[in-house]
């Protein structure tokens, strides 16, 4: 078989067709703290100096990021994340409320009050307060989510932009904030989950509004680029180690109808590879996600009991899989790496519909030489 382009390889893999080999990539960029550690462990400084900033769409805000573009250095298949701004416009004024030599408490551009430990960019901040407490707050913040605001699209959005994307041979990926993720960003996890029971009418309004907002915000983008958008991810993070934050019953009542609307719009425009991004153990919700039009999951966090081999056996070709390489095994060393890869890749490569990737961001406790060994060993199974 002749060598495929990254896009051809991705699409063949995701459609259970033959490819020259599996894609080699990290589905999430390698973060700053990890790169800083690797520079002390052998990563050439020349590979970092001069790197341009890339755009990375985070949960609610599109932002310019200092993530290192590792595609060329490691020989990854390129995956480009499209930038549509699904965040509040105008942004909230970022301001510092308290600062010491150890931490800083601030209001961020999304309106969230949080505590940041100085000198650490990897990991989660401590979230302290959110903008929405009740229906009055919700009605007020809704004004910041106008799908017709032209600032939501790239500055160079034009016919030339479209023509340029049609010439690319790598994967084009659109990330959007999902329904649970949005409620969490607006209210905080515990208050939002409580709202499903304490004020179901408010929850229903948030879910309905968000489905309409997503569709109308991306409508021109999707209807113009159509199937040149190779895949879509709906970011949720609605599970933890021991299961989802909400029950299947709650998902079915509040989220399933909205999932069907969004995925129906995407599929109508030729986009049929639709992932949900959720850390933790999301297994109880998989049948409902499939019913809602989703056909892929990542990052399949091993520490939460997610296992790609088991999922492939249970769901067959109905479910696409990305991730599930245990970050802890890569940190441990060669023997653990070989066991992790050897126990999964032979079967998953044969069955198809799977792309190996570490089961979240590459953390700074993975030594550089371990990561290089992991990639070299992984290539034997692609």
Please place each PLM-identified region on the residue numbering.
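Segments that shape or occlude catalytic/ligand-binding pockets
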Residues: 35-93
């Amino acid at each position: 078989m002749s060598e495929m382009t990254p896009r051809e390889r991705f699409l063949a893999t995701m459609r259970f067709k033959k490819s020259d080999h599996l894609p080699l990539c990290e589905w999430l960029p390698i973060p700053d703290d990890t790169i800083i550690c690797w520079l002390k462990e052998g990563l050439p400084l020349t590979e970092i100096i001069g790197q341009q900033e890339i755009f990375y769409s985070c949960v609610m805000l599109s932002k310019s990021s200092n993530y290192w573009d590792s595609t060329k250095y490691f020989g990854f298949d390129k995956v480009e994340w499209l930038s549509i701004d699904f965040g509040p416009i105008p942004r909230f004024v970022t301001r510092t409320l308290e600062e010491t030599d150890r931490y800083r408490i601030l209001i961020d551009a999304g309106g969230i009050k949080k505590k940041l430990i100085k000198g650490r960019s990897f990991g989660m901040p401590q979230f302290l307060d959110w903008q929405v407490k009740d229906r009055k707050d919700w009605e007020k913040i809704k004004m910041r989510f106008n799908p017709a605001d032209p600032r939501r699209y790239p500055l160079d959005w034009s016919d030339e932009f479209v023509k340029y994307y049609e010439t690319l041979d790598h994967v084009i990926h659109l990330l959007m904030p999902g329904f649970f993720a949005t409620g969490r960003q607006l209210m905080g996890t515990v208050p939002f989950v409580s709202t499903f029971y304490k004020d179901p009418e408010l929850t229903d309004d948030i879910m309905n509004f968000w489905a309409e907002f997503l569709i109308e915000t991306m409508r021109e983008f999707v209807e113009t680029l159509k199937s040149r958008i190779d895949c879509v991810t709906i970011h949720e993070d609605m599970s933890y180690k021991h299961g989802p934050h909400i029950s299947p019953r709650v998902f079915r009542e509040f989220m399933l109808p909205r999932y069907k609307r969004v995925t129906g719009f995407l599929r109508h425009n030729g986009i049929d590879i639709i992932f949900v991004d959720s850390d933790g153990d999301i297994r109880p919700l998989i049948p409902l996600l499939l019913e809602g039009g989703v056909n892929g999951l990542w990052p399949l966090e091993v520490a939460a009991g997610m296992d790609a081999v088991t999922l492939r056996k249970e769901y067959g070709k109905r479910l696409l899989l990305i991730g599930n390489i245990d970050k802890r095994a890569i940190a441990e060393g060669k023997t653990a790496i070989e066991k992790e890869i050897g126990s999964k890749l032979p079967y998953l490569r044969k069955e198809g519909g799977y792309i190996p990737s570490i089961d979240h961001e590459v953390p700074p406790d993975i030594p550089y030489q371990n990561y290089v060994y992991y990639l070299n060993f992984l290539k034997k199974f692609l």
